[in-house]
Amino acid sequence: MEKLDKIRMSQKLSCWQHILTTLGTSSKTEQEWNTFFKGFLESWRKPYCIQTSCDPSIPLRKELLVRPRKALQENPHGPGSTLPESPVFLEPINSTAPREHPSPSKSHSTGSTGCDPGNGERSPSVSNKNSKYKNPGNSKYAKIWKRSNNHTTSIFSKAQISKRRDKLSSTKKRPDTCAPTDDSRKNREPRACAPNKNIFKTRETNAPNLTKNSCALPNVLILSPNSASKITQRGHSVGQTQDYKASPGKIIKRVPRYSLQCLKKKTEKVHNKIMDKPKNKQQPQTPPPFLLNNEYTESSDDSDDQLPLSELSQKMKSNKLNTLFLSRNEDCSPAPEKVKLKGERPAQNKKEQLTWEPSILTNLTDLGKQVAEPLRKSVKKSAKQQKPRVRAPPQGKKTLPQLQTGLKTQDKQSTHEMISEQAKTISEASGQQTSQVQSSLSPNNIRNNSVKLISAKTLMPAQRSQDYSPNKMQVGQPLGFAIELPSPVDGKEASVEIDTQLVHTSKFLENMTRPSTVEVHKFDLMDIFMGENEKLDYEYDDDDVLSVAASWNGLDDENVPEDEPRKEAKTAEQLPKPEPSTETLKPIEKENAQKMQSIKSFQIPKLNAKNLKTQPSVMRSIYENEELEKNKVLAKPAPPSLVHQPLAESNRNQRDEATAARRAKETFPVFAPLYRVAPESAATLVSANSQQVIPQVYFSTSNQDGVNWIKDVFGIRCMQSVDNKCISINCDHTMNSLGEVQKRLMRMDEDTLLSLYRQTIRSFFLFQTYYTSFVDIFKFRNLWQYLLIMLVDCRLYKSISAPLLAHVYEALSKCGMQKEAVKRIMEHVWLPCKAHKYRDLMLTTLNILSNANWEDYCDKLTQLDKDYNFEIPHKNLITILKSSVDCSDKFANALKLITLHPNSIRTNETIMSILSNASKSYSYMHNESASASQGPPGAASFLAPPAAIQPPHTTVPNFGYLPNPSFHYSNEYAINIHNFD
């Protein structure tokens, strides 16, 4: 038998997926699906076979799980016939195989079998139109499953056989079940009341209703009045014929098969079948060894019809000898109606499944009793001893040889005792065990019925027949035949546990002599090879040629510590010598400890000078030479650089030394750190050499360090917010305050501070927020050169640089670097072409320029007004006029700027008052006639008519104007900060 557990889990799950797809996951609850899945996995561990036979004369294998046969796959009645609503399974009465739809309460019931209404033959599950053998006696299945005709009795006559040979052309009505009146049916009365027969009761055609008879069973098959039924009785079965053309309003109830209250006991014979691999199904199988003397013939009555009368009579005589009748007279009373429980297939219940099924025996033969007797005796003797030892092998996980070996260890319970216990459990679960039945049954009958109950509950779905081989174990073979070991018990061959043999083996190994671990001291070993008076002498001897004094490297006064005694293995521990019992253990331990210390702590003593003189001449010369070598002065080792220096490196060093020797030594000036002079000297240097340009100083620092400094110093929690790229709503964009940032900047060194500033100018937001903090720190540390660099950096962000430019210029003006600052502004920040775009920056530049040396850049101011149409504000002109009143050259340049827009100047009272005061002071110095002709240039233009003056140009609106110039976040974030031109 193949082991199903070898099938991969993926294949099992694919089958389960097909089941779920077919039924639908919503058809059952989750708890029911879990129960079904456990039973589904358990079903793969059960042995099974597939009976492909459709021949009703061949019984099903009762010791294996058989796939149910489908009925009426093809319609034998023509196109006008209709199939039954539920499947019908054809099965002989003497077969105890499981049925298609069993349940816990239906284990005793049998299925109805259909017969052809035309000829009275038993109709197979598949139409005989396509069958190869028209007669069941010639079927190949009849040749394969040959078994003795156990249920054929001597009551049947040759006339009855001839009637069956004529196919029972005349229809016979079924007599009453318990009270037959027909004389021709009297011979069949034992079979009519047998418990294994299908008993049907039909209503008459004209009778509208039919009440239950007192002798009838509670579960009967009742057909509708319109249905036609013909009853055909055989030697082995009582079949029912249904006309499927009739109306479907039929009521089918199953009859309990093993009801024992109103039926007589049927005589059965032991059937034994042998399963072999389905390689050649046409080869007949040999019977079991304990049934070799019995006749092994065909099991079909139809096959008996094909025999000659002479052979048939001989067969009938042989069957009479082997047939055992057990008659039982019982009262004909209706059995209690069975309760039908809703549940799944019994094959899914693990408790009702057996690893092996014995043969179904209604009456044990003498051979079965002889086999069971030694089993009962052995069980009673060794039940208590074998119970903790015997373990049942896992179900469905062993092959046939392993299964037989494992069954040898399970001899603690006999066959009939185990069957009776499980039958009791099944009957209690179904609720059909009553006191009345128990009182009316004998132990043998209970056992036989239990076997039938168990066999009827082992139905399970099987798999393909070509993939697995059938079971080789003989059916009905008791456990004693399979478990035989060559160990005589009471002069007989009985079953012996393997564990018992293992126990004897272990006892034998324990009784074997083991080598004793003798612990011997080294002293004892020495005493064996030495005499009693001989001992090791470690003292000095003049005759010794060699001495171990040279191995001493310590000092003379050195105290040598005693070595701790070495821990030896447990087997090598020193055992005390046997001494009289009067002595105590303490002196023995002390003596042994002193002995161990005296031996292990021994060292060869160093020789003194006196002892050295007494040494032999050879040893004396050796010692003297060693002392001379120690007193010699060791030569100084060569420098390691010269010793280990490679040749190429030494040649290169020599060339460098020769080159340096040929050149004269030159002195190089020592330069101080750049841009770290005092403020006073710096102001003097700038004023003396105004053309000097201070370069920008950049320090190389890694970007990663700068990013880390930015996070720590400024307290930035979201780097995406620095570049205005954060899209999160709940992100934290808060930073440290200006005071906290300035405290951190003050504690930094100069290089770190400058590096952090270079990282800051890369961000528009950080530049706008912390620019003034860096200006204050550089001013506090007198780093004026870095302030000039910061002044130039205002060109990077022109839209926000107007207040920043004023702040840094104010810091530079305090140290006297105004001209240098104006020069940097006019070189890098002055952009007349973008004056209208960055009006704030241009106005701030004009304010700085009007308060500084504006006369040096008068041409640029004139160009700004004429070429770029940017009018200089009046407040800047007023500042320029006030600063040039005392100087005639500057005043002349100021008048040039004023005359650019004479109409707007005339409306300004401040400018007109300054000009009038200037003209009065100039006329006071000269005569009035000369003052009119030699007045300041441009004075005559003020008297010109307004029409002669060119109208002023319209101003372009300022798109980059900031209404609230602050150092915090503003709307100027969207301006392209990289557009510097």
UniProtKB/Swiss-Prot annotation:
Q: Which GO terms describe its cellular component?
A: centrosome; cytoplasm; heterochromatin; nucleus; Rhino-Deadlock-Cutoff Complex
Q: Where does this protein reside within or beyond the cell?
A: Nucleus; Cytoplasm, Cytoskeleton, Microtubule organizing center, Centrosome; Chromosome
**What keywords tag this UniProt record?**
Chromosome, Cytoplasm, Cytoskeleton, Developmental protein, Differentiation, Nucleus, Oogenesis, Transcription, Transcription regulation
Q: Where is the composition biased (Basic residues)?
A: 377-390
The domain of life for this entry's organism is: Eukaryota
Annotated region described as Disordered, given as residue ranges: 72-195, 274-307, 327-352, 375-446, 554-586, 642-662
**Membrane: is it a keyword of this entry?**
no
Q: Does the keyword Cytoplasm apply?
A: yes
- The segments labelled Required for interaction with rhi/rhino in the record are 1-60
Basic and acidic residues: bias regions: 167-191, 337-352, 409-419, 652-662
Bias class Polar residues marks the residues at: 104-113, 150-160, 422-446
Biological process (GO) annotations held by this record are: fusome organization; germarium-derived egg chamber formation; mitotic spindle organization; oocyte development; oocyte karyosome formation; oocyte localization involved in germarium-derived egg chamber formation; oogenesis; piRNA processing
Bilayer-spanning residue ranges:
none
Q: What does the record note on quaternary structure? A: Component of the Rhino-Deadlock-Cutoff (RDC) complex, composed of rhi/rhino, del/deadlock and cuff/cutoff. Interacts (via N-terminus) with rhi/rhino (via C-terminus); this interaction is direct. Interacts (via C-terminus) with cuff/cutoff; this interaction is direct.
State the name under which the record lists this protein: Protein deadlock
What species does this protein belong to? Drosophila melanogaster (Fruit fly)
Q: Species lineage, top-down? A: Eukaryota, Metazoa, Ecdysozoa, Arthropoda, Hexapoda
Quote the gene name from the UniProt entry. del
